[in-house]
A protein has these predicted regions:
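Glycine- and charge-enriched low-complexity intrinsically disordered segments
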Residues: 90-111
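Short, Lys/Arg- and Gly-enriched loop/turn segments at beta-strand edges
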Residues: 61-68
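Amphipathic alpha-helical segments that form coiled-coils or helix-hairpins used
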Residues: 1-13, 49, 130, 134-137, ...
Length: 186
């Protein structure tokens, strides 16, 4: 990850990822802080791109997301609490992210965690590289990713629908019970 000082942040540029951007399986692009392209270039080892995996190694352990091909930006800078993983051609990054969200995957990911002070993974990159994962052939990985991503999309759509319904119910409630002028006399 990177060690970015507060004075380096600007209003627009290359987004910096932190723990709040690592929700569930995928990258949350709701809010960002930014650094200039020049600063991002100087932090080349802390740059993550579409197709990369980002893992939190200090703080909220167990966070692991995939940067999708249709992400808002083509490049991100990871904070000092994360590290980046690039997969070889034997594994789909989405499959690996799904795997590390299973109880077995979380156990393997967190087996070297220190709980003294701020939770952290010891030597995160080298420890991660030593984790053994039995991988099915690519065709099976693709099928697993298709099934889980279809379910994930339905979950997101349902959440958006629920949020919309909640906003409508709140507006009706506010209009009828809080806005006294809207209540007919009598």
């Amino acid at each position: 990850g990177s060690n970015i000082k507060v004075s380096c942040f600007v209003d627009s540029g290359v987004p910096v990822l932190n723990g709040s951007n690592l929700e569930g399986f995928s990258l949350s692009e709701k809010t960002f802080r930014y650094v200039t392209r020049e600063k991002a270039d100087s932090l080349n080892k802390a740059n993550a791109h579409r197709g990369d995996i980002v893992i939190t190694h200090r703080g909220t352990l167990g966070q692991i997301v995939f940067i999708p091909q249709d992400s808002k930006y083509d490049r991100y800078v990871i904070s000092q609490s994360q590290f980046r993983v690039r997969c070889n051609d034997k594994v789909l990054p989405e499959y690996l992210v799904y795997y590390f969200h299973t109880p077995i995957g979380q156990h393997k990911l967190l087996s070297n965690a220190s709980q003294v002070g701020v939770p952290a993974l010891a030597r995160p990159s080298s420890t991660f590289q030593q984790i053994e994962v039995v991988l099915p052939e690519l065709s099976i990985q693709k099928r697993v990713v298709e099934i889980i991503s279809t379910i994930q999309k339905k979950i997101v759509n349902n959440q958006e629908l629920n949020d919309n319904l909640y906003a409508q119910a709140k507006a009706i409630f506010d209009n009828h019970f809080i806005n006294i002028d809207a209540i007919p006399a009598g």
